[in-house]
Design a protein with these regions (language model features):
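Short, acidic/polar
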Residues: 15-25, 99-102, 186-195, 322-332
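Glycine-rich, proline-tolerant flexible connector loops at the mouths of alpha/beta enzymes
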Residues: 34-65, 90, 122, 127, ...
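Active-site mouth loops of central-metabolism enzymes
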Residues: 5-17, 87-97, 177-188, 243-246, ...
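A structural motif
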Residues: 30, 110-111, 200-201, 338
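An alpha-helical appendage that flanks or caps ligand/catalytic pockets
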Residues: 134-172, 212-332, 372-374
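N-terminal beta1-alpha1-beta2 module of alpha/beta enzyme domains
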Residues: 1-78, 82, 181, 374
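Hydrophobic faces of well-ordered beta-strands that scaffold small-molecule active sites
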Residues: 5-9, 33-35, 84-86, 114-118, ...
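Conserved, mostly hydrophobic/aromatic
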Residues: 37, 75, 106, 147, ...
Length: 374
């Protein structure tokens, strides 16, 4: 069966918020606009200083995040055509009844264009604020149950779970034109993939490091859907695909020397780096983005880590090359089932001169990908 492939666009939800390009994003080029939702960024503030990056001259902090649901509501009334997705709001910081209501609200504002993108949460956005992050997967599954229950019940409901209790709870807000917003989720672990197959309509991997890895995880999602009586092919396969785009080997070498690019290893689990033949500079137990916590990453530890980062390790794990090379690599993921890619050029984090060209490089890669896949 021939699948439709269309890229997605990112809209940064940090200050200063720029909504000036929404007309271009609403033009039909993109499948959807994706809005990240964080309290804390993946980049340590200890190296977000002019000493390490000139990006700090534009923004005093990498953590000036806005609420993605609120930004989505604004985007909903400023656009007419393109779907709008959170990528992703977690089910730790938000009660499922509020997620259910907010999703319906934004879907009405957008006239049926909202995608509720959810995830099980991350350390940096939960632990510093006192949220219980002890059983994120169980809470995630129960949240999806509650959202679906409130949406689909015509009468007040009771629910008793491990995390949530409802007594005569109702959500009488009807869906826009009789259709509930699709739920997409980001995940890679076996249990999460099974949950997504049961409850969700779209999927992003939290990590997929080869086309075969992507295909295997997508097979798990769709297999779960089929086992639970759902149409497996109705689940949209998406991916926030991180890469390094450079016009030359010389430019790539410059990008790899940038501290914020080196710090990308914080997001890579040690077990993944071992698969590519490299030790992780933070040790064998490092779990990637799940372990990012400002409290345990002081400046001294970050600086010591940067000294240990091997550029060859980043090149082994992260796809890289010219826009055309990037497109050819990404085509392998399309052949593995990917339908909605978002090309995320991490090279833009190398500094202002690289950030200035990043969007154009991504666009060139998108154009070449669409040419390759027809």
């Amino acid at each position: 069966m021939t699948q439709t492939v269309q890229p997605a666009a990112f809209l940064r939800t940090t200050l200063p918020l720029d909504l000036s390009k929404l007309d271009a994003l609403d033009s039909g080029r993109y499948h959807s606009i994706w809005l990240p939702d964080h309290m804390v960024s993946f980049w340590p503030d200890s190296i977000w200083t002019p000493e390490f990056t000139d990006l700090a001259t534009l923004s005093p902090s990498p953590h000036r995040h806005l609420d993605a649901m609120a930004v989505a509501a604004a985007v909903a009334v400023l656009t007419k055509n393109v779907p709008i997705a959170t990528s992703v709001v977690d089910t730790v910081r938000r009660h499922p009844s509020l997620l259910a209501q907010s999703a319906l609200t934004i879907d009405h504002l957008s006239r049926g264009r909202f995608i509720l993108g959810v995830g099980s949460g991350e350390t940096e956005n939960t632990i510093p604020y006192g949220f219980d992050f002890s059983k994120p997967v169980g809470r995630f599954e129960e949240s999806l149950k509650v959202i679906r229950l409130l949406w689909e019940s015509a009468v007040p409901v009771d629910f008793s779970g491990e995390f949530y209790t409802l007594r005569h709870a109702r959500l009488d807000t009807e869906p826009f034109e009789g259709r509930f917003p699709p739920i997409w989720a980001g995940a890679s672990g076996p249990r999460m993939l099974d949950i997504i197959g049961r409850y969700c309509d779209g999927w992003w991997p939290a990590g997929a490091y080869s086309p075969d890895d992507y295909a295997s995880k997508l097979k798990a999602v769709r297999g779960s859907a089929e086992r639970h009586g759902r149409d497996p092919m109705a689940i949209t396969a998406a991916f926030i695909w991180t890469c390094l785009i450079a016009d030359s080997d010389r430019e790539l070498a410059q990008i790899l020397e940038a501290p914020l690019v080196k710090a990308y290893v914080l997001q890579i689990p040690a077990k993944i780096m071992r698969q590519f033949g490299f030790p992780h500079p933070l040790g064998d137990e490092w779990r990637g983005y799940q372990d990012i916590n400002p409290e345990v990453l002081p400046r001294e530890r970050i600086l010591a880590m940067l000294e240990k980062v091997d550029p060859a390790a980043i090149l082994a794990v992260v796809p890289h090359g010219t826009p055309h090379q990037i497109a050819r690599t990404l085509k392998g993921y399309v052949e593995a089932g990917l339908q909605v890619p978002k090309i995320l050029d991490y090279g833009g984090m190398a500094g202002l001169q690289f950030a200035a060209r990043s969007a154009q490089k991504v666009r060139e890669a998108e154009d070449e990908l669409m040419r390759l896949v027809g």
